[in-house]
Structure formats: structure tokens, C-alpha cells
Amino acid sequence: MRAIIKFKDNSYINISADYIATQDDFVKVWNGENLVAMVRQEEVSACYLSERRE
């Protein structure tokens, strides 16, 4: 599965992940037990899991 994080400036990242959580004003993306991304919520326009690579 992939996590797609789209930023307000229309850029995005696409990384291998299986869980997304929000905590303390951050979007945190996990792959198993590993934290693979942490982004301030104010910079994000969308964040979701996808089964296909975009």
C-alpha cells in the first residue's frame, strides 16, 4: 500500500506505508513499526492510503 501526501503548493510524496495518523498537529505515516514521514498538518491539503502507485 502507498501513502500519498499532497501539499498546499501542489507537490506530493508517494511512499510505501500501511497506516496514517494525526497527532500533535502532525500527519504521521507508518510502514509497519517504522515512522516513514512526519509533516505539519498546516502544510497538507490531502493525505490518504492507496493500493496502487500514483
Question: How would you label these PLM feature ranges?
Answer:
Residues M1, R52-E54:
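Short intrinsically disordered terminal tails
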Residues Y12-N14, V36:
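Short, mixed charged/polar active-site loops
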Residues V29-W30:
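Core beta-strand residues in small-molecule sensory/regulatory alpha/beta domains
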